[in-house]
Amino acid sequence: MKIAVCVKQVPDTTSPRRLDPATSRLDRSGEGAINATDINAVEEALRIKEAHGGEVVVVSFGPTKALDSLRKALAMGADRAILVSDEAAAGSDLVATSYALAKALERESADLVLFGQQSSDSDGAVLWSAVADRLRRPLVSQVADLGIDGATVTGKRQTEFGYDV
């Protein structure tokens, strides 16, 4: 089973955040780190790989600085890393980011694609749905427990009414 995990390099949450006055975007010149919930997704992919075999590929779209996050995922045990990068894409919106990630994921032909809950720099929590839509693949979000049985994937998520499976 090939599992792709999308990860994002975000500003270190322990340093102050500022807007770049020239671009009105988040200043990303300081220290960066792999997004915290993406670490959870990498760990889940590695757990699945350990139980069922396969390959874990981490994918990121961003500046070359994002290589730091990819290296962290490789150090955790991921097999390969892919960085999609273009300086002209700095500050890309949801549409451009989902397009770039979907194209990279199409080339990988992953059996399962995982994302973290949301990024700590924007709290958007919608990129995964845009990528799933572009890939024309089913989406299960907010998953707290993931199960694999052959070619069947099940997810359990908590709602205000209990659990959905």
Residue ranges of model-derived segments:
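N-terminal glycine-rich FAD/FM-binding segment characteristic of electron-transfer flavoproteins
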Residues: 1-165
